[in-house]
Every structure is written in C-alpha cells, then in structure tokens.
Amino acid sequence: MNYDKLMRKCFNLAKKGHTSPNPMVGCVVLDESGNIISQGYHKKYGENHAERDALLKLKNGEERNGTLIVNLEPCNHYGKTPPCSDLIVERGIKKVIISNKDPNPVASGGIQKLENAGIAVVTGVLEDEGKKLNEVFFTNIIKDRPFIVLKTASTLDGKISTKNGDSKWITSDKARDCAHKLRKKYDCILTSSSTVLADNPQMKHYKKNCIHEFVRFDAGIVQPKNYVSLCRSRWNSMWFFLKRRFG
C-alpha cells in the first residue's frame, strides 16, 4: 500500500479548507480491500473535522475493517464537534495512518484511544511535509506566538519608488498574485501609516469567507478622512497603534 501517495492526497484535500485557528486536515477512507470509498476535509472552523466529513458520507458500513488516512492525529475532545476518535472506533476502522501527532494538549490523545480500542496506528508518514502544511498551527501551539510572513517589494538597487512618487508598480503580475494569496491565507494584515497615506491600499483578497483583522502602525494620527470608513467595509476588525506626542 502506497501510504505516501494517499497522504499527499490528504494534504491536497486539506488545502481546500480555510480553517484558522484550526489546522488544515484531509482524510481518505479505504475499504477492507484497499479501495478508496470516501474522502473529506475540514472546510471551516466550527464545521465537521476531516474524519467526520469522510465517515458520515458512508451509510452502509463499507468502512468496517478498513483503513483511514489522515494528516493529523484525530481529536479526542468535545469542542465544536464530538471527538473524531470516538467515531473512528464506532465505525469499525482497523487501521489509521497519520502524518503528524497533534501538539495541542487540549485535542491530543486520539492515538492512545484508538490503540486502546485495538486499532493499529501508524504515525510519521511524510511527517515533515505535514508540518510544513500546518506550519502556522504548529507555531501557534508549540511556540505560543503568531506565524509571521514579511511581504516587501523593492527594486534591484533597494528602492521602493521613484523620488517623485509617480511610479505605480515595481512588482510583476506574478508577485502581486503572490501577495493576494498571502492575504487570503493569513488572518491579519499589518501595514504602516506611510503606506496608507501614499497608496491608500485596498488590501483585497479573492477568497470568500475569509475573516481578517487589519492592523496599522502610525507615526502620527494623520489619515485620509474616508480611510476608516473604507476599512470598516473591508475588514472584520481594525487595530490602530498610535504614537503619542508629548511636549
């Protein structure tokens, strides 16, 4: 059985979801003969996890004595949804293949529950790729801090615009497309007041159902009169950090 190939299928399924602050998870279910009979993924925070999404599609018990492949250890706690580990045991799965153990102490423990129920568990399949997929989640949980990406644009000689400011783009279409992908992937966008005053950036993203926060660092309090109202129409919330002037 080529578990690497099936795990990569889980990774690709997982990428379809927009799950923050939860991890991205995909799942594939095989019958006793090794045929794929169902697949699922965690679509959105608060909705069914990948294992539940895949298993609830099966109505006739064809998953019994089968194998479940998932890129993250099945959860073992009651949160927005019941424990996936309980459902896996209930459905008679005999083997579970996992890429990464869950570092979150609140949700972990699924592997132990599965093994206690007599289910064979294999971990560490494409482990590094699994960690890369959920690097934001792992950083949040293990290091207790946000995962930060710096996006900057400059010319080959280190400039950001012409002296008179009349230059519009110094980046290519490919680079701007990359910026849009970053905006839809991350939960918060931070910029400076100088960027706001010079460009009045819209910070658009192309993915529906994204919930973003907008953070702006100010050297002063000057801003375009219509800027706050524009931001309110674009973002879930805004944070302003202002430098107080004394004297």
Question: Model-flagged regions — what are they?
Answer:
Residues 139-140, 145, 149-152, 156-230, ...:
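Active-site ligand-binding patch in enzyme domains
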